Swiss-Prot record:
NCBIfam families: PRK04949.1. The gene is cysZ. It is a multi-pass membrane protein. This is Sulfate transporter CysZ. Its main location: membrane. Belongs to the CysZ family. Keywords: Amino-acid biosynthesis, Cell inner membrane, Cell membrane, Cysteine biosynthesis, Membrane, Sulfate transport, Transmembrane, Transmembrane helix, Transport. One of its GO terms (biological process) is cysteine biosynthetic process. InterPro entries: CysZ_sulfate_transptr, Sulfate_CysZ.
Length: 250
């Protein structure tokens, strides 16, 4: 199946079509259920505390910046929603990572017409230790940067103004890495090489990640994002990145 090059935004919307495609839909179910259970519970807790958290945070602004509260409230709300959703989506992805990898494999097979690796339950079971190890690698990459940004948020004025923007950009980049990594990992391409490939294509990576981050922050909609993002990221791999890692190019 031939597909044309798209923007990062375009690959996300294409992921919606792919997730609904006959033959792929059945591989969407388990990643979807994991996300609904974890992210749904997190959103319920978040919305019962969101207003209090934002009011306390904005209350730390110096009096001469109090006029910014009208601008910062929606920005902080979006940032907290995206961060919460990213954290619990990451947890859901960790649990469902073998099934996300399988979904990416089936999407690539659908788009390219080529079989990717072994098939069957035993092949999936054999891959579980490697897949979970890869998820730990992603967490080790994220945590130091997330800690640094969290400390930025604690700085008066700076944390309330630049902090949310920095968090949103960071979340977009990490979501691009999270979902693009599944097809890369299916081909045993190292985390380092995957990250460098995305850095060389930052406009597509950030465009894709920003749209995922935006929809991840929308209640109800965010429950369905994981399989859509896996499908869209795999389409991006097939069209944009796969040729760069072809054995003929090594």
């Amino acid at each position: 199946m031939q597909i044309s090059s798209r923007s990062g935004f375009g690959y996300f919307s294409y992921g919606i079509r792919l997730a609904l495609t006959p033959g792929i839909r059945r591989f969407v179910v388990l990643p979807l259920l994991a996300n609904i259970i974890l992210v749904g519970g997190a959103m319920y807790y978040l919305f019962s505390h969101l207003d209090t958290w934002i009011s306390e945070w904005i209350g730390q602004l110096p009096s001469f910046l109090s006029w910014l509260s009208y601008v910062l409230w929606p920005l902080l709300a979006l940032t907290i929603l995206a961060t919460f959703s990213y954290f619990f989506s990451t947890l859901a992805n960790f649990i469902a990572s073998p099934f996300n990898g399988l979904l990416a494999e089936k999407v690539e097979q659908h788009l390219s017409g080529e079989r990717i690796g072994e098939e069957g339950v035993w092949a999936l079971v054999k891959d579980v230790p490697r897949i979970l190890s890869r998820e730990w690698r992603k967490l080790l990459y994220v945590l130091p940067k997330a800690l640094g940004l969290f400390l930025l948020l604690l700085i008066p004025a700076l944390g309330q103004t630049l902090g949310p923007i920095a968090w949103f950009l960071f979340t977009a980049w990490m979501l691009a890495i999270q979902y693009c990594d599944y097809p890369f990992d299916n081909h045993k391409i190292s985390f380092h090489d995957m990250r460098n490939t995305l850095k060389q294509n930052q406009s597509k990576a950030y465009g894709f990640g920003m749209l995922v981050a935006f929809f991840t922050s929308i209640p109800i909609v965010n429950l369905f994002i994981v399989p859509v993002a896996v499908c869209g990221a795999t389409a991006m791999w097939v069209m944009e990145f796969k040729i760069q890692h072809s054995p003929l190019r090594q």
